[in-house]
Curated annotation (Swiss-Prot):
Gene from which the chain derives: asaA
Protein name as it appears in the record: Ankyrin-repeat domain containing transcription coregulator asaA
Organism this protein belongs to: Aspergillus flavus (strain ATCC 200026 / FGSC A1120 / IAM 13836 / NRRL 3357 / JCM 12722 / SRRC 167)
PANTHER family listed in its UniProt record: ANKYRIN REPEAT AND PROTEIN KINASE DOMAIN-CONTAINING PROTEIN, ANKYRIN REPEAT-CONTAINING PROTEIN-RELATED
Induction details: Expressed during the earliest stages of maize kernel infection.
Region (Disordered): 1-70, 112-137
Biased composition (Low complexity): 112-130
Residue spans of biased composition, Basic and acidic residues class: 1-10
Protein role: Transcription coregulator involved in regulation of gene cluster that mediates the biosynthesis of aspergillic acid, a hydroxamic acid-containing pyrazinone with aliphatic side chains that originates from leucine (Leu) and isoleucine (Ile). Aspergillic acid has antibiotic properties and was shown to be lethal to mice.
Keyword terms, alphabetized: ANK repeat, Repeat, Transcription, Transcription regulation
Keyword Metal-binding: no
Gene3D superfamilies: Ankyrin repeat-containing domain
Cited InterPro entries: Ankyrin_rpt (IPR002110), Ankyrin_rpt-contain_sf (IPR036770)
Residue stretches of biased makeup (Basic residues): 11-33
Disruption phenotype: Leads to the down-regulation of expression of asaB, asaC, asaD, and asaR; and completely abolishes ferriaspergillin production.
Length: 338
């Protein structure tokens, strides 16, 4: 019970010290404002506040002085005790009353010297502020002439010869594009609607890319300097290859139980055993071997499944293939070891 009581007493002492420190700050601020004559309770400050709140305030100008700068203008700001922060005494010490500012420090632009002494104060600066600068419309061509150099633009308008609103952007000549004749020659044979024939496409199984088997020859004039690409070789695969490539063990066993050929090849000459070795799934490789997959079959490149496993550094697949009943030391020719 003693320790919490001491902590509560220490907290109360710190709170009282903070309250006294804040009170001393407020007293110092009021004393500083009283010395400057800005305290709202003093008669002098009340008279100054009434002068600042009057709407008919006038500035007496001296026409014989050089009125050039406004850097030394200072204005009085009325702050109450509730709005005054205890951390602003250095800022408030820099404020001066209008009666304390020498007239020599008040300066205006040169054109303000023609204002009569009894008139109200004119503009205080010859250069407009950022908020007073005129807005330049990007659609106005006359205002853009002073900002952009028309000689630096590749395409510009001649406003002297074109009426307003009817100017058109000139197009580039075909000589600037060296491939324009080739494009025209490619499109020259497409003008005859009777020349169009449906393309003959070979559909492959799911997941493979469709390729064009034949393209129609247009009877029109042939001016193309670049021949069309040669016919691509169609690709195909089987459902067993897809199941092995996706690592779906249950679908692979289901396909094998329904009579899928484990030695079927795809368009690259690879069996499902090759695909399993490429994916590094030695469990599926062992299941394929038990279901009758032949490890001596090579792909289109002449590689056995064992060669792919050794090339990939897959110790699990190498061990499963070496433990198979079929011989796996089938030689291959023209093997690129690089």
């Amino acid at each position: 019970m003693g320790a919490p009581h001491e902590e509560i007493q220490a907290l109360k002492r710190r709170r009282e010290q903070n309250r006294l420190a804040q009170r001393r700050r407020r007293d110092n601020v009021r004393r500083r404002l009283r010395d400057l004559g800005l305290d709202t309770g003093s008669p002098a400050s009340a008279s100054q506040t009434s002068l600042c709140s009057s709407t008919d305030s006038r500035v007496t100008l001296n026409p014989h002085q050089s009125l050039r700068s406004t850097d030394f203008l200072s204005f009085e700001t009325s702050n109450s005790d509730t709005e005054m922060s205890p951390y602003d005494p250095p800022l408030q010490s820099k404020l001066r009353l209008d009666s304390q500012i020498p007239l020599a420090e008040i300066s205006f632009p040169s054109y303000a010297s023609s204002v009569s002494p009894s008139s109200s104060a004119g503009p205080l600066s010859s250069s407009p502020s950022p908020s007073q600068r005129p807005f330049i419309d990007s659609t106005d061509l006359t205002s853009l002439q002073s900002v952009y150099n028309p000689t630096s633009l590749a395409v510009h308008l001649d406003e002297s010869s074109m009426p307003c609103g009817e100017a058109e952007i000139p197009t580039r000549q075909d000589s600037n594009f060296p491939r324009t004749p080739n494009l025209k020659s490619l499109m020259s044979g497409c003008n005859d609607p009777s020349a169009y024939q449906p393309w003959i496409l070979t559909s492959s199984t799911v997941g493979e890319q469709m390729s064009s088997q034949a393209l129609p020859h247009s009877p029109g004039p042939q001016h193309c300097s670049t021949p069309l690409p040669a016919e691509t070789r169609p690709r195909w695969t089987t459902a067993l290859h897809m199941a092995v490539s996706q690592g779906n063990f249950s679908v692979m066993r289901l396909l094998l139980s329904y009579g899928a050929d484990p030695n079927a090849v795809n368009s690259e000459g690879a069996t499902a055993l090759h695909v399993g070795v490429m994916n590094g799934n030695y469990t599926m490789v062992a299941e394929l071997l038990q279901r009758g997959a032949d490890p001596t079959l090579t792909n289109a490149a002449g590689w056995l499944p064992l060669h792919q496993a050794v090339h990939a550094g897959d110790e699990g697949c190498v061990r499963v293939l070496l433990e198979a009943d079929q011989p796996v030391d089938y030689p291959i020719s023209d093997l690129d070891y690089t």
